[in-house]
Each structure stands twice: as C-alpha cells, then as structure tokens.
Amino acid sequence: MFNIRVMTLDDYDAVIDLMKRTPGVSLRDADSRESTAKYLARNPGMSFVVEVEAGLGGCVMCGHDGRRGYLQHLVVLPQFRRQGIAKALVERCLSSLERHGILKCHLDVFKTNALAADYWRSQGWQLRTDIDRYSFTRSGDENA
C-alpha cells in the first residue's frame, strides 16, 4: 500500500537520497535545497512523494513555464516498482498541469538511461526526433 502526497521542502533530504540511489538520475547544483525551495514555491502543489511502509519510496517534480509542463526526477525504488506508483505520480502531475490550463508536458531522459526510455514509451510518451535541445550555462559551471 502507498500514499501519494504533495512534496514539501521537509522531504528534501529523503528525496535526494532516493535520487542518489537510483541509476540514471543525475544530481546537479540546481538540485540544491535552495533551488528546490524556489522550484516548489514557484510550482506549489505540483511535485509529489510516495509514502511506503519504510519511508519514501518514490517522488516526482513537476512545474511549468505558463505554456508547457515539465516533469523531472520521477523515481520509484526498485522494490516498489510494478505497483502503479509511477503511473499514479505522473497522473497527479498531469492533472495539476491541466488545472492550470497546460495540456502538453515535456521531460528529459539521458540517452544512456534505457530503462527510463522504455518506461516512457510504454506509457504512450513520444520521443521527439524533430528537435534538439541546446543548453547554455552562464557561469560556465557544467554542474549548474
């Protein structure tokens, strides 16, 4: 049995621990407590955690830019997978976005993360081949 609730900054340490224990998830300076606090404040009630018997078993962060939604860091620990947790987390995010009038959502998957790519394809998400994403880091710090 699991319980999904809104993520708060009090969950930060446990969420970072989940991410560190999950292959394919990259943590950057942008995942700092301060940056996470700003993200949660800018996108209230849109990121979620999953409570399981032993603590947190999963999480997802969700936000938008006013036009498009974005999912980041969907994580479910291996022992809790195949129970519908990831699907329920994503549905909460998409419903939250829809309440804000946002019907299209994007996410990024590292090309080396085949497990995640397989999951998203199995859920009906489409791999975009018509665009390339470019990034620029003003500070020059590639960990930002």
Segments from the language model and where they lie:
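Acetyl-CoA-dependent GNAT
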Residues: F2, V6-H73, L77, V90-R92, ...
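Charged, low-complexity surface patches
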Residues: T8, A86, V109
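Glycine-rich acyl-CoA binding loop
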Residues: V50, R82-K87
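Short aromatic/hydrophobic contact patches that present stacked aromatics
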Residues: V75, H106-D108, S135
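Active-site acidic-Proline motif in GNAT/NAT acetyltransferases
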Residues: L77-Q83, K111-T112
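Conserved active-site alpha-helix within GNAT-family acetyltransferase domains
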Residues: K87-A88, R99, K111-D130, F136
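Conserved GNAT acetyl-CoA-binding A-motif
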Residues: L97-V109
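Short, charged/polar, Gly/Pro-enriched secondary-structure boundary elements
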Residues: D141-A144
